[in-house]
From Swiss-Prot:
The gene is amiE. InterPro entries: Aliph_Amidase/BUP, Aliphatic_amidase, C-N_Hydrolase, C-N_Hydrolase_sf. HAMAP family: Aliphatic_amidase. This is Aliphatic amidase. The active site is at E59 (proton acceptor), K133 (proton donor), C165 (nucleophile). Pfam families: CN_hydrolase. It comes from Helicobacter pylori (strain ATCC 700392 / 26695) (Campylobacter pylori). Catalyzes the hydrolysis of short-chain aliphatic amides to their corresponding organic acids with release of ammonia. Hydrolyzes propionamide, acetamide and acrylamide, but has no activity with formamide or urea. The natural substrates of AmiE in its gastric environment are not known. Probably functions to ensure nitrogen supply to the bacteria. Belongs to the carbon-nitrogen hydrolase superfamily. Aliphatic amidase family.
Length: 339
């Protein structure tokens, strides 16, 4: 893990995160013009950082937030489509990989709300991962939720998963990606005040807890509704910050992520190897007791057992300690039911 140079090496993946200014757009033509601007940014960053292998843009950086429902449907993208073609050409031309936001992606059933989607494009211009946000930011966001995470081989073989904004507030998604082999978890977000300190803290904690690199790209600026705090960052698998932007519009950070170092740590670390220890619980004591050398593999957590085996029961249980309705009468949002 290195920070401060403009290079990369056969073992290191050069990663840049962009504090992209939140656009305020209304039409398809405006969206496509913004895509072309993003393509220009890629070319400029590659010129300045010749070691760049992967560039990451925030959630909503392509479309902005369409506060008008009809505009949201009118500007929703197909994958592949006109927007992705612009990104693909930029990645191919500059020989870099890129992560791009589509808010939204058309639902397969035209009348249903679009998805909030990220795509990972390789340096040949091919879409190698399409991730749909599993946990939209309710009650404000009205995206149709996705249903799974993905892990793919990224630049130089580094294994990459994509997550989006509010997804990252749930430890389960980080653990799912890491347990499936992700070595870099990319979190693209359009996060606004007042949650700045919490969001800076959680990505460090999740990198540490899951022995994984984390790259965060967040929006900046004011779109007339929300003020976005930036602080795009790159975190090492030991939870230390390698590079972090401030609140500057269109700033960026860059670091080199070693493929070998993270694999070495996951293989040889002992006291802080959370991934191994979770599925080999108490192995020291179990071995000393003569009960084998694998520890305990069974899940000890009642909530997770219930969730997997009886999701409706788990939902009912959480309503007992929170509330039974999606809406809140004391502070209604839209037409969400409060009873």
């Amino acid at each position: 893990m290195r920070h401060g140079d403009i290079s990369s090496s056969p073992d290191t993946v050069g990663v840049a995160v962009v504090n992209y200014k939140m656009p305020r757009l209304h039409t398809k033509n405006e969206v496509l013009e913004n895509c072309r601007n993003i393509a220009k940014v890629i070319g400029g960053v590659k010129q300045g950082l010749p070691g760049l292998d992967l560039i990451i843009f925030p959630e909503y950086s392509t479309h902005g937030i369409m506060y008008d429902r009809q505009e949201m449907f009118d500007t929703a993208a197909s994958v592949p489509g006109e927007e992705t073609a612009i990104f693909a050409e930029a990645c191919k031309k500059n020989k870099v990989w890129g992560v791009f936001s589509l808010t939204g992606e058309k639902h397969e059933q035209a009348k249903k709300n679009p998805y909030n989607t990220l795509i990972l494009v390789n340096d040949k211009g091919e879409i190698v991962q399409k991730y749909r946000k599993i946990l939209p930011w309710c009650p404000i966001e009205c995206w149709y939720p996705g249903d799974k995470t993905y892990v793919v081989d990224g630049p130089k073989g580094l294994k990459v998963s994509l997550i989006i904004c509010d997804d990252g507030n749930y430890p389960e998604i980080w653990r799912d990606c890491a347990m499936r082999g992700a070595e870099l978890i990319v979190r693209c977000q359009g996060y606004m005040y007042p949650a700045k300190e919490q969001q800076i803290a959680i990505v460090k904690a999740m990198a540490w807890a899951n022995q994984c690199y984390v790259a965060v790209a967040n929006a900046t600026g004011f779109d007339g509704v929300y003020s976005y705090f930036g602080h795009s960052s790159i975190i090492g698998f030991d939870g230390h910050t390698l590079g972090e932007c401030g609140e500057e519009e269109n700033g960026l950070q860059y670091a080199q992520l070693s493929v070998q170092q993270i694999r070495d740590a996951r293989k040889y670390d002992q006291s802080q190897n959370q991934l191994f220890k979770l599925l080999h619980r108490g192995y020291s004591g179990v071995f000393a007791s003569g009960d084998g050398d694998k520890g305990v593999a069974e899940c000890p957590f009642e909530f997770y057992k219930t969730w997997v085996n009886d999701p409706k029961k788990a939902q009912e249980n959480v309503e007992k300690i929170t509330r039974p309705s999606v809406g809140v009468a004391a502070c209604p949002v839209g037409d969400l039911p409060t009873k």
